[in-house]
């Protein structure tokens, strides 16, 4: 078996890769900026081009205090955003005073064949410096054979001055390709923030 080597002796200064080695990478597909938006929807750019897509979220800030951030998906040109999913969630958190910390399963914000919007974060505050940031990985959304798996991780500033690290994962229980995704807070608008969609090669 032939071995391929990088064309440089220093790993800190690799100038090129052999032609047979693929560099891979993230391709920015689209970007949306919230401005008192009731929802943010991505309705194009998700197809069979990539096996994996990633949504990245930057300082998503609610207009209304004490609100969790959520998402759902749909197929074709449908806009009901009510796909059936089964999910799991857990959290780690601590307050600013250091007097409270928690690690545990999030009973009540998971779904077992539910069709509601899936919770991704704790209840985020609307003070000027409070927001959430994170990402969602989506695997083979265009498959017509398998269910659609996702993994999400978010860091948020909870409304009572607590830091939370939220882990959410699951699958959309459909073999129909998913083509669109929608994001929103449980109540009120997304006052500000940026969401970017990437394709992973």
Segment roles from a protein language model:
Residues 2-201:
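Surface-exposed molecular-recognition determinants
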């Amino acid at each position: 078996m032939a071995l391929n080597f990088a064309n440089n002796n220093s790993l800190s200064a690799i100038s090129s890769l052999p032609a047979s080695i693929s560099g891979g990478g993230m391709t920015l597909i689209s970007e949306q900026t919230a401005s008192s938006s009731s929802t943010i929807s991505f309705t194009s750019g998700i197809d069979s081009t990539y096996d994996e897509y990633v949504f990245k979220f930057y300082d998503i800030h609610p207009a209304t205090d004490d609100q969790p951030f959520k998402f759902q998906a749909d197929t074709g040109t449908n806009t009901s955003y009510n796909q059936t999913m089964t999910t799991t969630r857990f959290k780690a958190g601590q307050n600013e005073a250091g007097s409270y910390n928690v690690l545990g399963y999030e009973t009540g914000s998971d779904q077992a064949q539910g069709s509601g919007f899936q919770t991704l974060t704790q209840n985020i505050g609307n003070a000027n410096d409070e927001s959430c940031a994170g990402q969602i990985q989506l695997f083979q959304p265009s498959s017509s054979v398998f269910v659609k798996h996702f993994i999400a991780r978010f860091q948020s500033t909870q409304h009572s001055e607590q830091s939370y690290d939220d882990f959410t994962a699951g699958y959309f229980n459909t073999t129909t390709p998913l083509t669109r995704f929608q994001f929103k807070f449980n109540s009120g608008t997304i006052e500000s923030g940026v969401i970017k969609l990437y394709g992973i090669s």
